[in-house]
């Protein structure tokens, strides 16, 4: 499972011009599900993201998590995060999970994040073409892969 996490002042996602999820200050999580991901990857990644101390404390140090700041989390599925560009110029998406595997893991990730936040995470629509709008804060952008745990 691979995620691009962006600290945002605000973010929203729309499908066919209709906003399906929006947050004020918090984290935008672009989430790619790999073909070999398991519920253990979901649990680890959700825990890691919710505990990341990338919000400033009273002294201006990155020392607070999205949970501690009562921020929002917007999760958007994005299989293209699993692209391989090793050969040629056309990306291969063979590492991405097929929709029948990816969708339940995406839903489980949303549930895990919501549980850790103590409120629902906002989301896009799995498999849909979406328009994502965001205002970066920092910018602070991290890439985390559950198969490369550090």
From Swiss-Prot:
Q: Where in the cell is it found?
A: Cytoplasm
MF terms from GO for this chain are: D-tyrosyl-tRNA(Tyr) deacylase activity; Gly-tRNA(Ala) deacylase activity; Ser(Gly)-tRNA(Ala) hydrolase activity; tRNA binding
Task: Look up the EC number in the record and give it.
Answer: 3.1.1.96
Please name one Pfam family that this protein belongs to: Tyr_Deacylase
The record ties this protein, via SUPFAM superfamilies, to: DTD-like
Instruction: Specify the enzyme's EC class, one word.
Output: hydrolase
UniProt xrefs under InterPro entries:
Daa-tRNA_deacyls_DTD, DTD-like_sf
Q: Is-annotated flag, keyword Ligase? A: no
Residue ranges annotated as motif Gly-cisPro motif, important for rejection of L-amino acids: 138-139
Record-level GO cellular component terms: cytoplasm
Q: Output the superkingdom of the source species.
A: Bacteria
Main subcellular location = cytoplasm
Provide the catalytic activity annotation: glycyl-tRNA(Ala) + H2O = tRNA(Ala) + glycine + H(+); a D-aminoacyl-tRNA + H2O = a tRNA + a D-alpha-amino acid + H(+)
Carries keyword Hydrolase? yes
Q: Which GO terms describe its biological process?
A: D-amino acid catabolic process
Q: Which UniProt keywords apply?
A: Cytoplasm, Hydrolase, RNA-binding, tRNA-binding
Q: How does it assemble?
A: Homodimer.
Record text about domains? A Gly-cisPro motif from one monomer fits into the active site of the other monomer to allow specific chiral rejection of L-amino acids.
In the record, the note on similarity to other proteins reads: Belongs to the DTD family.
NCBIfam families on file: D-aminoacyl-tRNA deacylase (TIGR00256)
* UniProt protein name: D-aminoacyl-tRNA deacylase
* Annotated source species: Opitutus terrae (strain DSM 11246 / JCM 15787 / PB90-1)
């Amino acid at each position: 499972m691979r995620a691009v996490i962006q600290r945002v002042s605000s973010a929203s996602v729309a499908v066919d011009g209709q906003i399906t999820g929006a947050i004020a200050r918090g984290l935008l999580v672009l989430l790619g599900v790999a073909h070999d991901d398991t519920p253990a990857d979901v649990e680890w990644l959700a825990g890691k993201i919710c505990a990341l101390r990338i919000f400033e404390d009273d002294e201006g140090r990155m020392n607070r998590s999205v949970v501690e700041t009562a921020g929002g989390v917007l999760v958007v599925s994005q299989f293209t995060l699993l692209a391989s560009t090793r050969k040629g110029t056309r990306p291969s998406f063979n590492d991405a999970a097929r929709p029948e595997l990816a969708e339940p893991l995406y839903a489980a990730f949303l549930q895990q994040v919501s549980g850790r936040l103590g409120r629902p995470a906002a989301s896009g629509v799995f498999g849909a073409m979406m328009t994502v709008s965001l205002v970066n804060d920092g910018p602070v952008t991290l890439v985390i892969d559950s198969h490369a745990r550090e």
